[in-house]
């Protein structure tokens, strides 16, 4: 009798949830079917999770890692064909899976009659696809199938040519794919399916943006990707702040872009108008070599000509001074941040050409500051004020940038917990003894998880139109 009372009490407490569940599962048979399904799924192998961090705009490397699943696809191919294919044949098959369109074009150049090639390759690809899909339910695989070939691929995945009763059936399907001229399209579709099934969930632990030229292309890929999340990095937050119109973030984003000569993301990616920036920099620093502001470029193939490098250096110096001024204004407005040690412009001795940082005097490597007023170093000139306002407008009206930031908000967070793994970017503030450091955030002292939650709350509030 007591058990019945407790049970009834629990049922009454959970009645709201039971009513909600009853909408989707109104009958006993539907409930039991769902229980059986979920319990069975729990006994499948754990789907493949993929972890990437610090992409920094390197889109080519990112795309290659997605295509080969960091070597996971090659490992599967070796498991299946290691004893039957030569090393070169394994490499060729893997290349086909990673880059099907390009590989097929090369094959067509070397061979006009591809019937035998397609016959062999299709059987190999079906075997690889069957292997990578084995972790998932049929329902999940079905949802991943390309609509154009969904029925055919599903039949081939679940019917084996080893079954004597189905040999003719499978053989005729493959022959007709080739005979109807659809082999190339089918190969590309199944290769892309293998890529997709090889990564069930993609975790990005911060910093899509920074020095590389293709952050916008990475975001385009992620916007169409089937399952991904991101734990925001410092560079991601900078771009999100810039998209929100924060002038300090805009100046910082531009300075870092000029530092690495990353103009593609700004101009080609997001359509940011650089003409006002270039005009201001050339006029203000016309007679300045700006040698300490020349861009850092590791890849010689990406290095612009000297004239362009000089212009980028001028823009780099111009926006750096604007950033230091805006940061100083921000620290003055928020003394509770205790960041007076970052107000460096006021430590400059213009006569001696030095600055003082943490009590140590350093000689300046550049002494030409035509826009700095020693009496009020953080005040923008009228021209600087006009420039930063125009740049702010460009960031606010960039539809592609705003769309990408919405994707970061939709899929992102300060930290994530997946399969008992704690994911976050870079570091968490800590004391010398290893305990979590308490930080004052708008009058609230928080640390660890509470700090992360509070920061994320502030980020989302900044984009909440309500």
What is each of the regions a protein language model found here?
Residues 1-466:
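Feature recognizes metal-dependent phosphohydrolase scaffolds
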């Amino acid at each position: 009798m007591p058990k019945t009372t407790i049970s009834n009490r629990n049922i009454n407490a959970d009645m709201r949830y039971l009513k909600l569940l009853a909408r989707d599962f109104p009958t006993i048979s539907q409930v039991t079917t769902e229980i059986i399904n979920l319990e069975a799924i729990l006994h499948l192998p754990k789907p493949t999770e993929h972890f990437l961090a610090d992409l920094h705009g390197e889109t080519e490397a990112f795309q290659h890692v997605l295509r080969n699943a960091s070597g996971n696809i090659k490992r599967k191919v070796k498991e299946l064909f290691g004893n039957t294919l030569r090393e070169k044949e394994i490499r060729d098959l893997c290349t086909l899976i990673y880059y099907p369109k390009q590989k097929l074009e090369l094959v067509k150049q070397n061979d006009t009659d591809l019937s035998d090639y397609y016959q062999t390759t299709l059987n190999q690809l079906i075997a690889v696809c069957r292997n990578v899909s084995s972790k998932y339910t049929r329902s999940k695989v079905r949802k991943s199938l390309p609509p154009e070939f969904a029925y055919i691929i599903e039949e081939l995945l679940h019917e084996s040519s080893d079954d004597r009763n189905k040999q003719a059936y499978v053989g005729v399907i493959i022959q007709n794919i080739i005979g109807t001229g659809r082999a190339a399209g089918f190969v590309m579709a199944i290769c892309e399916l293998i890529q997709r099934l090889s990564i069930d969930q993609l975790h990005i632990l911060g910093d899509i943006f920074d020095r590389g030229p293709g952050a916008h292309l990475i975001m385009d890929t992620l916007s169409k990707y089937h399952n991904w999340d991101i734990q925001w990095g410092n560079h991601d937050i900078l771009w999100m702040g810039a998209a929100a119109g924060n002038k300090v973030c805009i100046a910082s984003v531009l300075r870092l872009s000029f530092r690495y000569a990353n103009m593609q993301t700004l101009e080609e990616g997001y359509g940011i108008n650089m003409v006002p920036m270039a005009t201001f920099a050339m006029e203000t620093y016309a007679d300045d070599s700006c040698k300490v502001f020349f861009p850092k470029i590791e890849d010689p193939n990406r290095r612009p000509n000297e004239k362009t490098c000089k212009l980028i250096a001028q823009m780099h110096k111009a926006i750096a001074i604007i950033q230091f001024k805006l940061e100083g204004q921000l620290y003055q407005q928020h003394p509770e941040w205790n960041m007076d040690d970052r107000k460096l412009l006021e430590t400059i001795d213009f006569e001696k050409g030095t600055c003082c940082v943490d009590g140590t005097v350093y000689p300046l490597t550049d002494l030409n500051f035509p826009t700095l007023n020693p009496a009020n170093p953080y005040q923008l000139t009228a021209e600087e004020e006009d420039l930063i306002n125009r740049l702010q407008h460009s960031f606010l009206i960039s539809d592609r940038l705003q769309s990408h930031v919405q994707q970061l908000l939709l899929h992102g967070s300060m930290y994530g917990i997946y399969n008992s793994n704690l994911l976050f970017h870079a570091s968490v503030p800590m004391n010398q003894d290893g305990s979590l450091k308490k930080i004052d955030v708008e009058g609230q002292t928080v640390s660890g998880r509470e700090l992360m939650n509070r920061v994320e709350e502030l980020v989302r509030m900044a984009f909440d139109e309500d």
